[in-house]
Regions:
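Beta-strand signatures of extracellular beta-sandwich domains
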Residues: 66, 75-79
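Extracellular/periplasmic metallocenter environments
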Residues: 25-50, 73-74, 90-125
Length: 125
């Protein structure tokens, strides 16, 4: 009986440790600021912050970028310091895609490579 109690105690301690590590990892992942990109419908593209406002300036650092591609005729591509024409969604893709990006100081452009006039810019300080 005593050995079963010891095994149970070890299992409970191990489970608590796993839960703690899982919570810490989840907290780290959710700590990144979020950006929301949208391409389509039609010839529209946008990038908004967590408050829903158009991004014109950001602080350098890591961000979670969630792109909602609403048209299979476009792609969402990001270009700037340290990010060379990173295609986040392709023309055959419709739906959400989440990536982590590290933004350095400078000027960035987000655009559709198929329709380059579907384009906007922002600065990172």
């Amino acid at each position: 009986m005593r050995s079963r109690l010891v095994v149970l105690a070890v299992v409970l301690v191990a489970a608590a440790a796993l839960v703690t590590v899982g919570v810490a990892a989840t907290m780290h992942e959710t700590a990144l600021p979020k950006l929301k990109g949208t391409i389509g419908p039609g010839y529209t593209i946008s990038l908004k912050n967590a408050q829903g406002k158009r991004v014109t300036t950001l602080k350098h650092g890591k961000y979670t970028l969630v792109v909602q591609d609403k048209a299979n005729i476009h792609n969402f591509t990001l270009n700037g310091p340290g990010i060379k024409n990173k295609m986040i969604t392709g023309t055959s893709f419709v739906g959400p895609k989440t990536v982590t990006v590290t933004l350095k100081a400078g000027k960035y452009r987000y655009y559709c490579t198929v329709h380059p006039f579907v384009s906007k810019t922002f600065r990172v300080t």
